[in-house]
Amino acid sequence: MTGIELKSVAFNDHAAIPRRLSGEGDDVSPPLTWTAVPDGASELVLLCEDPDAPGGSFLHWLVTGIDPESSGMAEGEVPPGGQEWPNGFGRVGWGGPMPPPGHGVHRYFFRLWAVSEPLSLHGKPTVDAVHRAVRGQELASGTLVGTYQR
């Protein structure tokens, strides 16, 4: 399996996510770019999760149906062809970092998968449901990790 390179001009891998992208700031999605999407992908799937949340992994963003020929998107935009899903805050779209005050540094895993078939998701998918849906269809993936604390 090949690897997708996922990057952001807003923050480096394993570095702090800017406040403007958080729920305390403008709550806008980060600019992202990707390369090395393999041939044969039917779509890309983007997920952002916080595994350090007190109640278990928290869904901050889920976008399916992303055009596999695309290479990224600007800050505050939806990836080309993408369909946004409800996040853990109950809103459709991006929900920026908002860890509990004093809870320490949280990690935000941005995962981009190239999949062989469109995912079958319904309602308000959980992080676990997305991981299960991707399993067996993943052609390649890439991960970018940002951090945030309050």
Tell where the protein language model's regions lie, with residue ranges:
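N-terminus-centered regions that define maturation/targeting leaders and the start
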Residues: M1-R150
